[in-house]
Amino acid sequence: PRDAFLHWVDDTAPPEAVPMSLASTVHHLAGFWEGRDRDDIVLLHYDDLQVDLEGEMRRLAGRLGIDVPEERWPTLVKAAGFDEMRRRADVTAPDTETRIWKSNAGFFNRGTTGQWRDLLDEEALARYQARLAELAPPDLAAWLHHGSL
């Protein structure tokens, strides 16, 4: 895992040429980050969804102009929860038709963030932090790691 991670971090090919690298990921997200105040862009962060799923769902519905009857919220929030999404992975995981996952439920893994910290040594983490600092402004880097706009 370490070598694959460092290849992902260190790849210097143009972001549009390499679809799976830190540079391409940051390049992709930076466009949305720059437009985050536009009406047609809504940024959601997994950590924020974990902390307040219902609040984030209500925020999204509000931004999209969707009126949800109050009595429907508990059902919607339950359906969008991690355990329920994982239980229904064959319809909720992305690209279920192509079977890119060994198991669709595996897409949902453990439902936690920061698992990579336990897999990487200090040198690999330092390389990641340095490369991210080259690629992303501090506010985007902070949001990528912690969420909350």
Language model regions located:
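Globin-like tetrapyrrole-binding proteins
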Residues: 116-117
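PAPS-dependent sulfotransferase catalytic domain
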Residues: 1-78, 82-107, 126, 134
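C-terminal accessory extensions appended to soluble enzyme cores
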Residues: 124-149
